[in-house]
């Protein structure tokens, strides 16, 4: 980053009963090539076992970067991340940026350098990047299916980003939402990041995408099942409807939501007979479409899948 400054960054990590994942993540964080000041806070969301806190206690004395751990006993990832955000925004000296990674991820060494470069070049308030799946069994047919392909965009300004698992935000922007940046209504269902981005967009915040700022997500066998894929699609459907009901609350918006939900469900079911002839990938693709539609319809009746409880 010879042409740009290297502003200070506070890296926020929430963890819940993934000590091995947290250890791997912190190992890769220590390998970051970013030349600016980086401080790391881990918030353990398990008030009982505190396995994440134990990992930080082991690692911190020899860790290359300033590293601390707090425990957030209130259940739900929104509480953990909001705890981390509040600490980052009130830190002294104040960091210029706040970054976010999840405890089942690990970054490329150049990740933070690229995120900050894009933030500065495009003067963006919030920057996102791709998250690539890494499978325990890369030869599993689901791993090869394309169903797990990451969201991508060209590097540069975008209307929004796709999730907080790979994110950098101006601290001064985050501080304006500090009462509850991630709303606790989404604590167990997911979607709090999309809700936050929608609010930011409505407030005129700018977004950019850093397609070379790569993060990798570990995918154990429990995530390479048809059931997992369908539950995830159902949850995606409920998230979409919840947010549209909140931010696009009109008769036209309601009609659009129902058309999309019923259309996806109907198309998914109608395509099954042909999919049976084409093989298991086609069958699962049809079921995924139907699951997303079912999730959209379920959310109209305030029914949600609590993936994180």
Each predicted region: which residue ranges?
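N-proximal low-complexity "stem/linker" segments adjacent to membrane-targeting elements
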Residues: 1-31
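Short, flexible, basic/aromatic active-site loop/helix in glycosyltransferases
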Residues: 130, 143-160
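Conserved donor NDP-sugar-binding/catalytic core segment of glycosyltransferases
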Residues: 110-141
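Short beta-strand-to-loop acidic/aromatic patch adjacent to the donor-nucleotide binding site
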Residues: 93-106
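Acidic donor-binding loop at a coil-to-helix junction in glycosyltransferase catalytic cores
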Residues: 187-198
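Non-catalytic, C-terminal membrane-associated alpha-helical segments of glycosyltransferases
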Residues: 231-235, 249-309
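Glycine-rich, basic loop-to-helix element that forms the pyrophosphate-binding segment
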Residues: 72-90
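Acidic donor-binding segment of Leloir-type glycosyltransferases
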Residues: 30-70
């Amino acid at each position: 980053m010879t042409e740009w400054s290297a502003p200070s960054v506070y890296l926020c990590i929430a963890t819940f009963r993934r000590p091995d994942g947290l250890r791997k993540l912190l190992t890769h964080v220590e390998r970051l090539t970013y030349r600016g000041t980086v401080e790391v806070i881990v918030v353990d969301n398990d008030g009982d076992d505190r396995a994440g806190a134990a990992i930080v206690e082991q690692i911190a004395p020899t860790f290359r970067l300033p590293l601390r751990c707090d425990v957030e006993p209130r259940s739900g990832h929104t509480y953990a991340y909001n705890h981390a955000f509040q600490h980052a925004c009130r830190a002294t000296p104040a960091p210029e940026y706040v970054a976010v990674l999840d405890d089942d991820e690990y970054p490329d060494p150049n990740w933070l350098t690229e995120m900050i470069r894009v933030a500065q070049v495009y003067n963006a308030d919030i920057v996102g990047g791709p998250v690539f799946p890494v499978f325990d069994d890369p030869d599993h047919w689901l791993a090869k299916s394309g169903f797990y392909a990451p969201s991508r965009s060209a590097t540069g300004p975008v209307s929004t980003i796709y999730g907080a698992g790979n994110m950098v935000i101006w601290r001064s922007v985050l501080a304006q939402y500090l009462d509850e940046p991630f709303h606790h209504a989404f604590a167990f269902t997911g979607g709090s990041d999309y809700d936050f981005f929608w609010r930011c967009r409505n407030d005129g915040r700018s977004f950019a995408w850093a397609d070379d700022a790569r993060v990798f997500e570990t995918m154990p066998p429990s995530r390479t099942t048809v059931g997992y894929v369908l539950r995830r699609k159902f949850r995606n459907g409920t998230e979409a409807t919840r947010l549209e009901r909140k931010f696009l609350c009109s008769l036209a918006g309601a009609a659009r939501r129902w058309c999309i939900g019923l259309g996806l469900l109907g198309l998914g079911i109608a395509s099954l007979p042909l999919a049976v002839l084409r093989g298991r990938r086609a069958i699962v693709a049809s079921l995924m479409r139907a699951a997303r539609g079912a999730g959209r319809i379920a959310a109209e009746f305030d029914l949600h899948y609590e993936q994180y409880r």
